[in-house]
Amino acid sequence: MSTGAGSGTTKGGRGKPKATKSVSRSSKAGLQFPVGRIARFLKSGKYAERVGAGAPVYLSAVLEYLAAEVLELAGNAARDNKKTRIVPRHIQLAVRNDEELSKLLGSVTIANGGVLPNIHQTLLPSKVGKNKGDIGSASQEF
């Protein structure tokens, strides 16, 4: 007395319906970062007695956004240096050249990141010929 293969039930409506495919919370939220794992970390970390259902989803979205932002800037830095692989140096250049990320990660040390190239203005050679010519021509006019 089966009603058919596509109906989802057996014995004329009696019995258990066919199990549906489980869908992860990450795919429901449209994220790549693992919502379930972050929920587990929040619960086991004892940050609070209870953890709301939306908290791990929101935190996953924030972490995914930050990772995508850093990776995009680091990829641009790698391309500028004619490299196809992102190394810690590219991440350092990306973070330190971006004002907001530099403020967020100000106290963070990136291993093998190096330093930003910077030469103080007073140490650079000045344009001696142009400056003296301007001063000399102004004094000649008086």
From Swiss-Prot:
Keywords: Chromosome, DNA-binding, Nucleosome core, Nucleus, Phosphoprotein. It is found in: Nucleus; Chromosome. Phosphorylated to form H2AXS139ph (gamma-H2AX) in response to DNA double strand breaks (DSBs) generated by exogenous genotoxic agents and by stalled replication forks, and may also occur during meiotic recombination events. Phosphorylation can extend up to several thousand nucleosomes from the actual site of the DSB and may mark the surrounding chromatin for recruitment of proteins required for DNA damage signaling and repair. Widespread phosphorylation may also serve to amplify the damage signal or aid repair of persistent lesions. Residues 1-28 are annotated as: Disordered. The modification Phosphoserine is found at residue 139. Pfam families: Histone (PF00125), Histone_H2A_C (PF16211). Expressed mainly in roots. GO terms for molecular function: DNA binding; protein heterodimerization activity; structural constituent of chromatin. Residues 1-12 have a biased composition (Gly residues). It comes from the Eukaryota. GO terms for cellular component: extracellular region; nucleosome; nucleus. PROSITE patterns: HISTONE_H2A. A motif ([ST]-Q motif) lies at residues 139-140. Its main location: nucleus. The nucleosome is a histone octamer containing two molecules each of H2A, H2B, H3 and H4 assembled in one H3-H4 heterotetramer and two H2A-H2B heterodimers. The octamer wraps approximately 147 bp of DNA. Interacts with numerous proteins required for DNA damage signaling and repair when phosphorylated on Ser-139. The [ST]-Q motif constitutes a recognition sequence for kinases from the PI3/PI4-kinase family. Belongs to the histone H2A family. Variant histone H2A which replaces conventional H2A in a subset of nucleosomes. Nucleosomes wrap and compact DNA into chromatin, limiting DNA accessibility to the cellular machineries which require DNA as a template. Histones thereby play a central role in transcription regulation, DNA repair, DNA replication and chromosomal stability. DNA accessibility is regulated via a complex set of post-translational modifications of histones, also called histone code, and nucleosome remodeling. This is Probable histone H2AXa.
